[in-house]
Amino acid sequence: MNRLPSSASALACSAHALNLIEKRTLNHEEMKALNREVIDYFKEHVNPGFLEYRKSVTAGGDYGAVEWQAGSLNTLVDTQGQEFIDCLGGFGIFNVGHRNPVVVSAVQNQLAKQPLHSQELLDPLRAMLAKTLAALTPGKLKYSFFCNSGTESVEAALKLAKAYQSPRGKFTFIATSGAFHGKSLGALSATAKSTFRRPFMPLLPGFRHVPFGNIDAMSMAFSEGKKTGDEIAAVILEPIQGEGGVILPPQGYLTEVRKLCDEFGALMILDEVQTGMGRTGKMFACEHENVQPDILCLAKALGGGVMPIGATIATEEVFSVLFDNPFLHTTTFGGNPLACAAALATINVLLEQNLPAQAEQKGDTLLDGFRQLAREYPNLVHEARGKGMLMAIEFVDNETGYRFASEMFRQRVLVAGTLNNAKTIRIEPPLTLTIELCEQVLKSARNALAAMQVSVEEV
């Protein structure tokens, strides 16, 4: 029997939610009731699969903590009042911390003036953010398209490359094995994981995947395309594969890919949605090799963990294909004043506090500690790797990785696996994480591994 719409039920539910939003604290009974509600609503109205995932990485087989508020720049508090050190960082959105006061203030000030743009008049913050990114990004990157997420940023990059290269008879893209570029149809065509791709086949034609970090395979793909008349329009790469398991290519790989693109007249698209905004110890990971892309994709941390925003930045030569008709690719909420205010404040904080350099220093401290633990527990840990504050601990199998995440949850540290590689646990904290908290994270990791070792020995 079909359920009839109920305005009264919707009104009551929305009023209840607004009441919760207004509250700063909850008593014990309110906390218990909220937990039950959230679990029930996820099961009945969001997706029950999320509950099973949360259950697999939390302590005691619970469905996990119900998030309530930020505790500090570097911590989260659940409805039970438990404070967790955030080493997941919302998959890389909290580079400047949770509720950074500079970012929050900028958004609040803009909210008091004009939350969204008229679509017809020129909006100043979009112009100022585009100018700021032109100054901040490497090489000849100059023009920006703004959107709301990483996958939208990649979609824009692919369409821009198509519009530029189609008149030149070039239609094929090279992506890499293990890549993750998003889950909308175009971005998914560049993404490599079969689990995400197979249900939506056939995807967009014209995408080849070659092994990541293998410059010979990349060179062969270019040469074969030239021989067969199926010439390469663009290469799309992550400088470090995030969801693939924090996979670093050999030093010089990006430089060699840039040379191939120049030799064969292809565009280089760098997806820095996860590696950008100071995460790896430079503002952009491509700066470790002084590589200058033709198109750069940003999102996640660009909004300071306060507003969603993505950006696709391109050279004037490439972006000029949109000059005659700027409506060829647009989005209603892209570049809205609130999101641009957040992005401008985020860039200001990153530069004023020199957070990329801090990421390099504190990342070295954490990575050294994780590598020491890998040496101490070789039967559990295969490898620790990373750059800056983008790190991963790879375990011997998926089950061991899940167990580590659960044990860290007991230690009040949030971590999780990567989307393409379940046995790899990412460590991606805010760049504002203090040295004291870095030491606490390492202590918690040691305690977690020790508990896991005891369980192994008891079997």
From Swiss-Prot:
Pathway: Amine and polyamine degradation; putrescine degradation; 4-aminobutanal from putrescine (transaminase route): step 1/1. The lineage of its organism: Bacteria, Pseudomonadati, Pseudomonadota, Gammaproteobacteria, Enterobacterales. It is an enzyme of class 2 (transferase). The keyword Transferase applies. This is Putrescine aminotransferase. NCBIfam families: PRK11522.1 (NF008570), putres_am_tran (TIGR03372). InterPro entries: Aminotrans_3, Aminotrans_3_PPA_site, Class-III_PLP-dep_AT, Putrescine_aminotransferase, PyrdxlP-dep_Trfase, PyrdxlP-dep_Trfase_major, PyrdxlP-dep_Trfase_small. One of its GO terms (molecular function) is identical protein binding. PROSITE patterns: AA_TRANSFER_CLASS_3. Pyridoxal 5'-phosphate binds at residues 150-151, 274, 332. Belongs to the class-III pyridoxal-phosphate-dependent aminotransferase family. Putrescine aminotransferase subfamily. Signal peptide: none annotated. Catalyzes the aminotransferase reaction from putrescine to 2-oxoglutarate, leading to glutamate and 4-aminobutanal, which spontaneously cyclizes to form 1-pyrroline. This is the first step in one of two pathways for putrescine degradation, where putrescine is converted into 4-aminobutanoate (gamma-aminobutyrate or GABA) via 4-aminobutanal. Also functions as a cadaverine transaminase in a a L-lysine degradation pathway to succinate that proceeds via cadaverine, glutarate and L-2-hydroxyglutarate. Its EC number is 2.6.1.82, 2.6.1.29. Its cofactor is pyridoxal 5'-phosphate. Keywords: Aminotransferase, Pyridoxal phosphate, Transferase. It catalyses: an alkane-alpha,omega-diamine + 2-oxoglutarate = an omega-aminoaldehyde + L-glutamate; putrescine + 2-oxoglutarate = 1-pyrroline + L-glutamate + H2O; cadaverine + 2-oxoglutarate = 5-aminopentanal + L-glutamate. The keyword Transferase applies. GO terms for biological process: L-lysine catabolic process; putrescine catabolic process. The modification N6-(pyridoxal phosphate)lysine is found at residue 300.
